[in-house]
Amino acid sequence: AAATPQYDSEGNLKLDNLLTSTAISIKQGNVWEPLDDAASIKDGTQVQVEIVYSVPANAFPDGGNTATYTLPAGVYPKGDLSGNITDSTGMIIGTFALSKKSPTVTFTFSNDTSRTFTGTFKFNTTINYAETGGDGKIHLGEKTYTVEPEYSLNTKKEHTLSEDKSKVSYTVTVNAPNGTHDQTVTITDRLAAENTA
């Protein structure tokens, strides 16, 4: 049974419950290969997000031709994007627009919306662990992907010699540019036994 059309507060058709398939793909050579439904993806990986939707006949309000879709956290665009959307035959049926770091995609259709049609929307982005709110999950349609956080620590150790050259003071600076993802980080700084006399 076809899903009942739903509308946002501005009267735009919502595609969120009209999806027929979704995929997150990674590039293998020159080809985008869809990941398995429960795949893990490393933070910072370049991916292609794809949704396929089926719009029932006359789903748009009178005179309307715009629809929206809410992207899941973790795959928000890293810049403003726009482009064409196609039907199941590859024919252009309208355009999409996305704003940097916004979850809402806006579609403007130019095809005959009085008949049922299927459309495909794709865009490329970078997986972002921090956007997932700390649980590391991306929920796209009925699929859930796990983001593996990318850990990195930068350390720096500097020393200062006292004026009388009898003491050395050390300063150790540690920073985590990608955050610690709620993981405990333990730093140990020891002098070798032969250097303690």
Predicted regions and their residues:
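Carboxylate-rich, polar loop motifs that coordinate divalent cations or form catalytic acidic clusters
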Residues: 67
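Generic local-structure boundary detector
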Residues: 58-60, 78-82, 118, 179
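Short, hydrophobic beta-strand segments
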Residues: 108-113, 119-130
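A surface/secretory-pathway sequence property marking extracellular, secreted
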Residues: 3-32, 70-109, 193-197
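Serine/threonine-rich, low-complexity linker/repeat segments that form flexible spacers/stalks
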Residues: 2-59, 125-184, 188-193
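Short proline/glycine- and polar residue-rich coil/turn motifs
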Residues: 40-43, 97-102, 110-117
